[in-house]
Structure formats: structure tokens, C-alpha cells
Amino acid sequence: MKISTSQFKNGLKIIINDQPCSILEHEFHKPGKGQAVMRVKFRNLITGKVVDKTYKSGESVEEADIMTLEMSYLYSDGEQWQFMNSSTYEQIGINRNIVGDAKKWIIGQENCEVVIWNDEPISVEAPPFVELSIAKSDPGIKGDTVSGATKPAELETGVTIQVPLFVEEGEKIKVDTRSGEYSGRV
């Protein structure tokens, strides 16, 4: 389906150079002389690159047929990560390269958002917050409590993040997957 530049909005999925893209920002610009244009900043959903492009007012582009499904992570066999559709119970294998950064935060049974284009998964997003155990952490040094003092801690997934000094090895914590920061105790 074709969509006009006047209908652009942030988050809209369109096809550019035969690849799906998501509009991050758009701005209508009317110069004093000449035709009005729409300046668009978008992210390629396959490569992740952010690109700027200018369209003439009234131009149209193809809208991307993209589905976002909530799927539960089941297990990984090295190359393929197995996910199950939460509503149909259908299982699909997704290549580890497509899973990307989400693999740092998921260990099993988490509900992730899987983006599908042309019946193929193109990206996986971890839930915004996950609860993980601390696998390895040095004890906090008594007296080393300057405001906001932190120490490195390795999580059960192998990722190392900064946590407050009072958090100890074996504790479950809440982590913000978008920033990779400690969010609180569980």
C-alpha cells in the first residue's frame, strides 16, 4: 500500500531500497521559494543503520507489511534460538545474529517482541526489564560509600553491569535492558 509523505509519523514502517525501515523523525520544510519537502530520519530494520532522506511534498512510498509478535524464548542450540508464539504455540528458530543484543538479557521463558517481515524474523527485542541473578561480584568495601558508589557484577547471562555496593552475589536484581543498568532488587 502506498502512503503519502503527508501521512508520515514517527514509528511508521516503510520500504526504502527494498528494505523495511522505521521513521525516527520527520520534519516538514517549506522554503520561501520552491517546493515544500519532508525531511525524514529513519532506521533500516535489517542493518540498523540510521539514514536521512528528503522527499518532495506529495511523493508516496510503499508501507512495509511488518508484524510484531510476542513470543516466549525457549532455548538455544548455538546457532538457532527457539521462540514460541504465545497465542498459537507455534515454534520458530531464529538465527543468533538476528537475536542480536537481546541474547544478553534472556535466559528462558521471557516474552520478547519478534519483528517479522515477508514471513521472516528480522529482529528480536528483549522485554524492557528482566530479573537476573548475580553470578559473580566482589564484596563492597566498608567505608567506600561515596554517594552512588557502584561495583561491577557479572550476571547469570555473562553480562557485567555496575550495581550498588550493597548488592551481593546470588541476589536477584531487576535490570533495564534498554540501557543495561541496574534498576532495583527483586
Give the ranges of each region predicted by the language model.
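Acidic-enriched and Gly/Ser
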Residues: 2-156, 160-186
